[in-house]
From Swiss-Prot:
The active site is at K54 (proton donor). One of its GO terms (biological process) is 'de novo' pyrimidine nucleobase biosynthetic process. Belongs to the OMP decarboxylase family. Type 1 subfamily. GO terms for cellular component: cytosol. This is Orotidine 5'-phosphate decarboxylase. It catalyses: orotidine 5'-phosphate + H(+) = UMP + CO2. Its EC number is 4.1.1.23. GO terms for molecular function: orotidine-5'-phosphate decarboxylase activity. Substrate binds at residues 6, 25, 52-61, 109, 158-168, 181-182. It comes from Sulfurisphaera tokodaii (strain DSM 16993 / JCM 10545 / NBRC 100140 / 7). Coiled coil: none annotated. HAMAP family: OMPdecase_type1_A (MF_01200_A). Pfam families: OMPdecase (PF00215).
Length: 213
């Protein structure tokens, strides 16, 4: 599981959550809210810190943006629809030289996203060869398609909980990690809610495994 943080929560609470969730995705709202809070996040023991900047610009602009946060993040998220030449090619090259990773968005979780563009995005993804992809948990069919097309890539899936996708469904359809944010940090007891979500996910995954067998 990946914790999605779009706003600041008490560091003591985050530290407790970090005992159960070892990857975190940082959104623009949190970056704009308190840049100093990022220093506190980095001090915790995360396996991966992902900056969700949804980069979608020319190469020079994107490189300048990620350069500002290169010491905070292990990975960055960019849109794939912007294309390769003069955009993702240079961004990918820069991140690799910095020993950082790239995730490309292939399918978003909101209703307005159009998956008819997927064949175009798939070709871009094959050329750029990123660490992995963002595919909305609300689109299980797309998760299955992307998993079939990219068997060795990591799929991370937002949209669980607040956006309607059920806990565990994305994993059952081929995702590696589900991204959960508001269901945790907007709850009255984020740590307890984290434990409940993990338990629910484990039950769902075990059910899927039994069904497959």
């Amino acid at each position: 599981m990946i914790l999605s943080l779009d706003r600041q929560i008490p560091l003591s609470t985050l530290s407790e959550i970090n005992k159960y969730i070892h990857k975190v995705k940082i959104g623009y709202p949190l970056i704009l809210e308190n840049i100093e809070y990022l220093d506190d996040i980095v001090k915790l023991h995360w396996d991966e810190i992902i900056f969700d900047l949804k980069l979608a610009d020319i190469d020079n602009t994107m490189v300048l943006i990620v350069s500002k946060f290169i010491n905070y993040a292990d990975s960055f998220i960019a849109h794939s629809f912007i294309g390769i030449e003069g955009a993702l090619d240079k961004l990918s090259e820069f991140l690799k030289n910095q020993n950082k990773s790239l995730y490309l968005v292939l399918s978003m979780s909101h209703k307005g996203w159009n998956d008819e563009f997927y064949p175009y995005l798939k070709n871009i993804a094959k050329t750029i060869d990123p660490k992995g992809f963002v595919v909305g948990a609300t689109r299980p069919n797309m998760i299955r398609i992307v998993r079939n097309d990219f068997r060795d890539k990591i799929i991370i899936s937002p949209g669980v909980g607040a956006q309607g996708a059920m806990i565990g469904d994305a994993i059952c359809n081929g995702a590696d990690y589900e991204i959960i944010g508001r269901s945790i940090y907007e709850s009255k007891d984020p740590v307890t809610e984290t434990k409940k979500i993990i338990e629910t996910q484990e039950v769902k995954i075990n059910e899927c495994k039994r069904t497959e067998n």
